[in-house]
Regions:
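Short Ser/Thr-interspersed hydrophobic loop/turn segments at strand-loop and sheet-helix junctions
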Residues: 50, 73-78, 173-175, 193-198, ...
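A short core secondary-structure module
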Residues: 150-203
Length: 320
Protein backbone atom coordinates (compact mmCIF):
# COMPACT_ATOMS: atom_id res chain seq x y z
CA UNK A 1 0.00 0.00 0.00
CA UNK A 2 2.71 2.47 -1.02
CA UNK A 3 1.78 6.06 -0.34
CA UNK A 4 -1.46 4.88 1.32
CA UNK A 5 -3.11 4.21 -2.04
CA UNK A 6 -5.00 0.98 -2.44
CA UNK A 7 -3.74 -1.41 -5.09
CA UNK A 8 -6.15 -2.75 -7.72
CA UNK A 9 -6.43 -5.99 -5.75
CA UNK A 10 -7.19 -4.11 -2.54
CA UNK A 11 -9.79 -1.97 -4.31
CA UNK A 12 -11.41 -5.19 -5.54
CA UNK A 13 -11.52 -6.53 -1.97
CA UNK A 14 -13.24 -3.39 -0.75
CA UNK A 15 -15.72 -3.39 -3.62
CA UNK A 16 -16.61 -7.04 -3.04
CA UNK A 17 -17.16 -6.53 0.69
CA UNK A 18 -19.29 -3.46 -0.02
CA UNK A 19 -21.48 -5.49 -2.39
CA UNK A 20 -22.05 -8.06 0.33
CA UNK A 21 -22.84 -5.37 2.89
CA UNK A 22 -25.28 -3.67 0.51
CA UNK A 23 -27.58 -6.66 0.98
CA UNK A 24 -28.16 -5.58 4.59
CA UNK A 25 -29.85 -2.21 4.85
CA UNK A 26 -30.38 0.19 7.74
CA UNK A 27 -33.62 -1.53 8.73
CA UNK A 28 -31.75 -4.82 9.18
CA UNK A 29 -29.26 -3.28 11.58
CA UNK A 30 -31.86 -1.17 13.35
CA UNK A 31 -33.97 -4.25 14.01
CA UNK A 32 -31.03 -6.13 15.49
CA UNK A 33 -30.19 -3.25 17.79
CA UNK A 34 -33.78 -2.99 18.96
CA UNK A 35 -34.44 -6.69 19.50
CA UNK A 36 -30.96 -7.95 20.34
CA UNK A 37 -31.09 -10.47 17.48
CA UNK A 38 -27.61 -11.52 16.37
CA UNK A 39 -26.95 -10.77 12.65
CA UNK A 40 -26.71 -14.43 11.62
CA UNK A 41 -27.57 -13.80 7.95
CA UNK A 42 -24.83 -11.19 7.67
CA UNK A 43 -22.22 -13.46 9.24
CA UNK A 44 -23.24 -16.31 6.94
CA UNK A 45 -22.88 -14.04 3.91
CA UNK A 46 -19.41 -12.94 5.00
CA UNK A 47 -18.41 -16.56 5.62
CA UNK A 48 -19.67 -17.59 2.19
CA UNK A 49 -17.57 -14.82 0.67
CA UNK A 50 -14.49 -16.16 2.45
CA UNK A 51 -13.96 -12.97 4.42
CA UNK A 52 -13.81 -14.65 7.83
CA UNK A 53 -10.54 -16.23 6.72
CA UNK A 54 -8.99 -13.08 5.26
CA UNK A 55 -5.84 -13.27 7.39
CA UNK A 56 -5.77 -17.00 8.07
CA UNK A 57 -3.14 -19.23 6.39
CA UNK A 58 -3.94 -20.61 2.95
CA UNK A 59 -3.12 -24.17 3.99
CA UNK A 60 -5.89 -23.95 6.60
CA UNK A 61 -8.50 -22.63 4.19
CA UNK A 62 -7.83 -18.92 4.60
CA UNK A 63 -6.89 -16.28 2.05
CA UNK A 64 -3.44 -15.69 3.54
CA UNK A 65 -3.74 -11.92 3.19
CA UNK A 66 -2.21 -9.34 5.49
CA UNK A 67 -3.38 -6.87 8.09
CA UNK A 68 -3.88 -4.16 5.46
CA UNK A 69 -6.41 -6.28 3.58
CA UNK A 70 -8.14 -7.25 6.83
CA UNK A 71 -8.31 -3.57 7.73
CA UNK A 72 -9.95 -2.82 4.38
CA UNK A 73 -12.54 -5.54 4.98
CA UNK A 74 -13.48 -4.38 8.47
CA UNK A 75 -13.60 -0.70 7.58
CA UNK A 76 -15.90 -1.44 4.65
CA UNK A 77 -18.23 -3.33 6.99
CA UNK A 78 -18.43 -0.51 9.53
CA UNK A 79 -18.77 2.17 6.85
CA UNK A 80 -21.63 0.34 5.14
CA UNK A 81 -23.97 1.28 7.96
CA UNK A 82 -23.44 -1.95 9.88
CA UNK A 83 -21.32 -0.01 12.36
CA UNK A 84 -19.96 -1.89 15.32
CA UNK A 85 -22.87 -4.33 15.31
CA UNK A 86 -21.65 -5.70 11.99
CA UNK A 87 -17.96 -5.31 12.77
CA UNK A 88 -18.21 -6.96 16.19
CA UNK A 89 -20.16 -9.87 14.74
CA UNK A 90 -17.17 -11.00 12.68
CA UNK A 91 -14.29 -9.07 14.22
CA UNK A 92 -12.99 -11.94 16.32
CA UNK A 93 -12.83 -14.28 13.33
CA UNK A 94 -10.31 -12.09 11.52
CA UNK A 95 -7.33 -12.18 13.89
CA UNK A 96 -8.70 -13.77 17.07
CA UNK A 97 -7.81 -17.32 15.98
CA UNK A 98 -4.25 -16.32 15.00
CA UNK A 99 -2.65 -17.74 18.18
CA UNK A 100 -4.23 -21.11 17.37
CA UNK A 101 -3.29 -20.90 13.69
CA UNK A 102 0.29 -19.94 14.46
CA UNK A 103 1.16 -21.84 17.64
CA UNK A 104 -1.37 -24.66 18.01
CA UNK A 105 -0.39 -28.26 17.33
CA UNK A 106 -0.81 -29.40 13.75
CA UNK A 107 -3.86 -31.43 14.74
CA UNK A 108 -5.45 -28.50 16.57
CA UNK A 109 -4.74 -26.07 13.74
CA UNK A 110 -6.26 -28.31 11.09
CA UNK A 111 -9.24 -29.17 13.25
CA UNK A 112 -10.07 -25.66 14.49
CA UNK A 113 -9.21 -23.04 11.88
CA UNK A 114 -11.16 -24.34 8.84
CA UNK A 115 -14.30 -24.64 10.96
CA UNK A 116 -13.92 -21.08 12.26
CA UNK A 117 -13.39 -19.74 8.75
CA UNK A 118 -16.46 -21.52 7.40
CA UNK A 119 -18.60 -20.38 10.31
CA UNK A 120 -19.27 -23.95 11.46
CA UNK A 121 -17.66 -23.18 14.81
CA UNK A 122 -18.44 -19.99 16.66
CA UNK A 123 -15.73 -18.98 19.09
CA UNK A 124 -15.47 -16.42 21.85
CA UNK A 125 -12.35 -15.01 23.44
CA UNK A 126 -12.11 -15.08 27.27
CA UNK A 127 -9.35 -12.69 28.33
CA UNK A 128 -10.56 -9.70 30.36
CA UNK A 129 -11.43 -10.21 34.02
CA UNK A 130 -13.20 -7.98 36.56
CA UNK A 131 -9.86 -7.01 38.11
CA UNK A 132 -7.63 -7.54 35.09
CA UNK A 133 -8.40 -5.40 32.06
CA UNK A 134 -5.36 -4.05 30.24
CA UNK A 135 -3.17 -5.66 32.92
CA UNK A 136 -3.66 -9.17 31.59
CA UNK A 137 -0.78 -10.49 33.70
CA UNK A 138 -2.88 -9.89 36.84
CA UNK A 139 -5.63 -12.32 35.83
CA UNK A 140 -6.66 -14.89 38.41
CA UNK A 141 -8.27 -17.62 36.27
CA UNK A 142 -6.30 -20.79 36.97
CA UNK A 143 -5.64 -23.94 34.98
CA UNK A 144 -4.30 -26.87 36.97
CA UNK A 145 -3.03 -30.20 35.71
CA UNK A 146 -5.16 -33.24 36.45
CA UNK A 147 -3.36 -36.37 37.72
CA UNK A 148 -4.71 -38.48 34.87
CA UNK A 149 -3.91 -35.91 32.19
CA UNK A 150 -5.55 -32.75 30.98
CA UNK A 151 -6.39 -29.57 32.84
CA UNK A 152 -9.08 -28.14 35.10
CA UNK A 153 -9.88 -24.46 34.63
CA UNK A 154 -11.60 -22.17 37.14
CA UNK A 155 -12.16 -18.44 37.03
CA UNK A 156 -14.24 -15.52 35.89
CA UNK A 157 -14.09 -13.46 32.71
CA UNK A 158 -15.97 -10.33 31.71
CA UNK A 159 -16.87 -8.44 28.52
CA UNK A 160 -16.71 -11.68 26.56
CA UNK A 161 -18.56 -11.03 23.30
CA UNK A 162 -20.53 -13.76 21.59
CA UNK A 163 -20.57 -16.21 24.48
CA UNK A 164 -24.32 -16.80 24.16
CA UNK A 165 -23.94 -18.48 20.78
CA UNK A 166 -20.35 -19.79 20.94
CA UNK A 167 -19.58 -23.48 20.84
CA UNK A 168 -15.83 -22.89 21.25
CA UNK A 169 -13.86 -20.71 23.63
CA UNK A 170 -10.25 -19.48 23.71
CA UNK A 171 -9.24 -19.01 27.35
CA UNK A 172 -6.11 -17.53 28.85
CA UNK A 173 -5.37 -18.80 32.35
CA UNK A 174 -2.47 -18.82 34.76
CA UNK A 175 -0.74 -22.19 34.93
CA UNK A 176 2.20 -21.10 37.09
CA UNK A 177 1.70 -18.75 40.06
CA UNK A 178 2.83 -15.21 39.37
CA UNK A 179 5.25 -15.28 42.30
CA UNK A 180 6.95 -18.36 40.82
CA UNK A 181 7.94 -16.79 37.47
CA UNK A 182 10.62 -14.26 36.58
CA UNK A 183 8.29 -11.98 34.62
CA UNK A 184 4.56 -11.40 35.19
CA UNK A 185 3.87 -12.24 31.53
CA UNK A 186 5.24 -15.74 32.04
CA UNK A 187 3.20 -18.62 33.41
CA UNK A 188 0.06 -17.84 31.40
CA UNK A 189 -1.29 -20.43 28.97
CA UNK A 190 -3.89 -20.47 26.19
CA UNK A 191 -6.54 -23.17 25.80
CA UNK A 192 -8.91 -23.67 22.86
CA UNK A 193 -11.76 -25.95 23.79
CA UNK A 194 -15.48 -26.67 23.67
CA UNK A 195 -17.80 -24.18 25.34
CA UNK A 196 -19.18 -26.68 27.85
CA UNK A 197 -22.30 -25.01 29.22
CA UNK A 198 -22.48 -27.47 32.09
CA UNK A 199 -19.23 -25.91 33.34
CA UNK A 200 -19.37 -22.41 31.86
CA UNK A 201 -22.11 -19.89 32.55
CA UNK A 202 -22.46 -16.76 30.41
CA UNK A 203 -24.57 -13.89 31.74
CA UNK A 204 -25.36 -11.01 29.36
CA UNK A 205 -24.29 -7.54 30.51
CA UNK A 206 -26.80 -4.73 29.85
CA UNK A 207 -25.25 -2.14 27.51
CA UNK A 208 -26.21 1.22 26.06
CA UNK A 209 -25.45 0.18 22.50
CA UNK A 210 -24.49 -2.65 20.13
CA UNK A 211 -27.32 -4.75 21.49
CA UNK A 212 -27.19 -7.18 18.55
CA UNK A 213 -23.81 -8.53 19.72
CA UNK A 214 -23.97 -9.28 23.42
CA UNK A 215 -21.20 -8.93 25.99
CA UNK A 216 -21.07 -11.35 28.90
CA UNK A 217 -19.77 -12.11 32.33
CA UNK A 218 -18.43 -15.67 32.09
CA UNK A 219 -18.08 -18.02 35.05
CA UNK A 220 -15.86 -21.08 34.60
CA UNK A 221 -16.38 -23.81 37.19
CA UNK A 222 -14.18 -26.93 37.07
CA UNK A 223 -13.97 -26.99 33.28
CA UNK A 224 -12.01 -30.08 32.28
CA UNK A 225 -10.07 -29.86 29.02
CA UNK A 226 -7.69 -32.37 27.39
CA UNK A 227 -3.98 -31.80 26.93
CA UNK A 228 -4.67 -31.26 23.23
CA UNK A 229 -6.53 -28.03 24.09
CA UNK A 230 -3.29 -26.33 25.14
CA UNK A 231 -2.14 -23.88 22.47
CA UNK A 232 1.62 -24.06 21.98
CA UNK A 233 3.87 -24.28 25.02
CA UNK A 234 2.68 -24.04 28.59
CA UNK A 235 3.44 -20.63 30.07
CA UNK A 236 3.78 -18.80 26.74
CA UNK A 237 0.13 -17.87 26.31
CA UNK A 238 0.51 -14.14 26.92
CA UNK A 239 3.00 -13.81 24.09
CA UNK A 240 0.80 -15.87 21.77
CA UNK A 241 -2.17 -13.72 22.71
CA UNK A 242 -0.50 -10.61 21.34
CA UNK A 243 -0.64 -12.06 17.82
CA UNK A 244 -4.40 -11.63 18.04
CA UNK A 245 -4.72 -8.54 20.22
CA UNK A 246 -2.17 -6.24 18.59
CA UNK A 247 -3.54 -6.36 15.03
CA UNK A 248 -7.05 -6.16 16.46
CA UNK A 249 -6.24 -2.63 17.67
CA UNK A 250 -5.56 -1.57 14.09
CA UNK A 251 -8.84 -3.10 12.94
CA UNK A 252 -10.78 -1.26 15.65
CA UNK A 253 -9.20 2.04 14.58
CA UNK A 254 -10.20 1.50 10.96
CA UNK A 255 -13.69 0.39 11.97
CA UNK A 256 -14.11 3.57 14.01
CA UNK A 257 -13.14 5.62 10.95
CA UNK A 258 -15.66 3.68 8.87
CA UNK A 259 -18.42 4.34 11.38
CA UNK A 260 -17.43 8.01 11.54
CA UNK A 261 -17.57 8.28 7.76
CA UNK A 262 -21.03 6.74 7.69
CA UNK A 263 -22.24 9.20 10.32
CA UNK A 264 -20.63 12.14 8.51
CA UNK A 265 -22.22 11.12 5.20
CA UNK A 266 -25.66 11.08 6.81
CA UNK A 267 -25.05 14.43 8.46
CA UNK A 268 -23.89 15.96 5.17
CA UNK A 269 -26.92 14.58 3.34
CA UNK A 270 -29.21 16.06 5.96
CA UNK A 271 -27.41 19.42 5.78
CA UNK A 272 -28.05 19.48 2.04
CA UNK A 273 -31.70 18.43 2.28
CA UNK A 274 -32.83 20.46 5.29
CA UNK A 275 -33.97 23.87 4.08
CA UNK A 276 -34.47 26.74 6.52
CA UNK A 277 -35.16 30.34 5.50
CA UNK A 278 -35.00 29.37 1.87
CA UNK A 279 -31.64 27.60 1.75
CA UNK A 280 -30.01 24.33 2.91
CA UNK A 281 -28.59 24.56 6.42
CA UNK A 282 -25.28 23.24 5.06
CA UNK A 283 -24.68 26.65 3.50
CA UNK A 284 -24.33 28.12 6.99
CA UNK A 285 -20.77 28.18 8.31
CA UNK A 286 -21.96 27.07 11.74
CA UNK A 287 -22.97 23.75 10.15
CA UNK A 288 -20.45 23.44 7.32
CA UNK A 289 -17.30 24.11 9.36
CA UNK A 290 -17.85 21.37 11.98
CA UNK A 291 -18.59 18.90 9.18
CA UNK A 292 -15.40 19.91 7.39
CA UNK A 293 -13.39 19.55 10.58
CA UNK A 294 -14.89 16.11 11.21
CA UNK A 295 -13.92 15.06 7.68
CA UNK A 296 -10.31 16.23 8.21
CA UNK A 297 -10.02 14.41 11.53
CA UNK A 298 -11.43 11.21 10.04
CA UNK A 299 -8.95 11.35 7.16
CA UNK A 300 -6.07 11.85 9.59
CA UNK A 301 -7.23 8.89 11.66
CA UNK A 302 -7.57 6.80 8.51
CA UNK A 303 -4.00 7.56 7.47
CA UNK A 304 -2.83 6.51 10.92
CA UNK A 305 -4.70 3.19 10.71
CA UNK A 306 -3.42 2.41 7.24
CA UNK A 307 0.11 3.37 8.23
CA UNK A 308 -0.07 1.06 11.25
CA UNK A 309 -1.34 -1.94 9.25
CA UNK A 310 1.64 -2.42 6.89
CA UNK A 311 4.08 -1.38 9.61
CA UNK A 312 2.73 -4.11 11.87
CA UNK A 313 2.81 -6.70 9.09
CA UNK A 314 6.41 -5.80 8.27
CA UNK A 315 7.49 -6.02 11.90
CA UNK A 316 5.63 -9.30 12.40
CA UNK A 317 7.21 -10.81 9.27
CA UNK A 318 10.67 -9.92 10.54
CA UNK A 319 9.90 -11.51 13.91
CA UNK A 320 9.30 -14.99 12.46
Amino acid sequence: MAGFWLSDEQEAIRDSVERTCDRFDADYWRSGDETGAFPEAFVEAMAEGGWLGTAMPVELGGAGLGLTEATIVMQAVAQSGAGFSGASAIHLNIFGPMPVARYGSEALRRQAIPRIISGQDKMCFAVTEPDAGLDTTSLTTRAERRPGGGWTINGRKIWTSGAQRANKILIIARTTPREAVRRPAEGLSLFYCDFDRSRIEARPIPKMGRKAVESNAVFIDNLEVPDEALVGEEGRGFYYLLDGLNPERVLIGAEAVGLGRAALARAADYAKARVVFGRPIGQNQGVAHPLARAWAELEAANLMAFKAAPDFSSAAANAF
